[in-house]
């Protein structure tokens, strides 16, 4: 269910602004999206796992706040990220 180190490194390398960039909004949103996808798959197999459901909702809210921040500060990076991650643009 959790991302391993290799998957995280691959995501960071793809979305980082510069080398060893792990804190930018783009990287954080991409990592959250990967975790959300993983937990969503888990929830399809385990629909009664309510603690995972609450964790999923928390991650979705966190990603939503980060995306709102990125949209207001750097719209070009926001639109590029939405296209690459196949997310809805609100």
Curated annotation (Swiss-Prot):
Pfam families tied to this protein: Ribosomal_S15 (PF00312)
Keywords assigned: Ribonucleoprotein, Ribosomal protein, RNA-binding, rRNA-binding
A cellular-component GO term for this protein: cytosolic small ribosomal subunit
SMART domains: Ribosomal_S15 (SM01387)
The keyword RNA-binding is assigned to this record: yes
Record GO terms (molecular function): rRNA binding; structural constituent of ribosome
Any one biological process term the GO annotation gives: translation
UniProt superkingdom: Bacteria
InterPro entries referenced in this protein's UniProt entry, alphabetically: Ribosomal_uS15, Ribosomal_uS15_bac-type, uS15_NS1_RNA-bd_sf
NCBIfam families recorded: S15_bact
HAMAP family named in the record: Ribosomal_uS15_B (MF_01343_B)
Function: One of the primary rRNA binding proteins, it binds directly to 16S rRNA where it helps nucleate assembly of the platform of the 30S subunit by binding and bridging several RNA helices of the 16S rRNA. Forms an intersubunit bridge (bridge B4) with the 23S rRNA of the 50S subunit in the ribosome.
Protein family per UniProt: Belongs to the universal ribosomal protein uS15 family.
Subunit relationships: Part of the 30S ribosomal subunit. Forms a bridge to the 50S subunit in the 70S ribosome, contacting the 23S rRNA.
Protein name as annotated: Small ribosomal subunit protein uS15
Organism: Campylobacter hominis (strain ATCC BAA-381 / DSM 21671 / CCUG 45161 / LMG 19568 / NCTC 13146 / CH001A)
Lineage of source species: Bacteria, Pseudomonadati, Campylobacterota, Epsilonproteobacteria, Campylobacterales
């Amino acid at each position: 269910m959790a991302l391993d180190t290799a998957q995280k490194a691959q995501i960071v390398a793809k979305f980082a602004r510069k080398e060893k960039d792990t804190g930018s909004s783009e990287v954080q949103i991409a990592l959250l999206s990967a975790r959300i996808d993983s937990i969503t798959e888990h929830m399809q197999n385990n629909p009664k796992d309510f603690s995972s459901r609450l964790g999923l909702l928390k991650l979705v809210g966190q990603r939503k706040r980060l995306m709102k921040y990125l949209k207001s500060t750097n719209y070009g990076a926001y639109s590029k990220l939405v296209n690459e991650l196949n997310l809805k643009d609100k």
